[in-house]
Amino acid sequence: MCVSRFSKIVPVALLLALSACATPPSHINDICAVFEQRDGWFDNWQDSAKKTEQKYGIPVHVLMATVRKESGFKGNARPKRTKLFGFIPWTRVSSAYGYSQALNGTWSQYQRETGNFTARRTKFADAVDFVGWYHSKTVSNYGVAPDDTFRLYLAYYHGWGGFKRGNWTPEIQKYARDTDDMARRYQVQLRSCGG
């Protein structure tokens, strides 16, 4: 009888555990749909983004447009692998990983400076906090306005050294314009879902 009861509890527990895992939102161009997403039962994406805005002064629409451009809201996103001899999967072009596509070194710097040593790039709340931290350092060190998505994204993509040099390719400027356009759309959409 105990075995029978246990065999019924295990599948239910597994189902509940799996239902708590986040899947990427299917409508990433609609911030209200994105904000219906949760990491587990308790971590609400909208609450996490608002907390980050309050902490660092970077508007929610800027934060979310950056995450959208970097990972498409996929928590396990990584750069594609290069190919050896044109067909054998080889190394990745960078160590970028997670929602924020933070590089290993920059993520370590974030953890040291914030004291958040348990932060994970695959957890949305941690990743959006990283984006806020990074953008706020760009604001304070380079005089970029907190709502200047175009310039914030250029610094995010190139790193602070590349941003300071200012030699951005037309392709990267297009990425930054696209991110700025998305931020503007998100800003308008936020009015209808409590942003």
Regions found by a protein language model. Give the residues of each.
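Selective for proline/serine-rich intrinsically disordered segments
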Residues: I9, A22-T23
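Bacterial N-terminal signal peptides that target proteins for export
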Residues: M1-V10
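Flanking scaffold residues of small Cys/His-coordinated metal-binding clusters
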Residues: A13
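Catalytic glycan-binding domains that act on GlcNAc-containing polysaccharides
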Residues: T23-G195
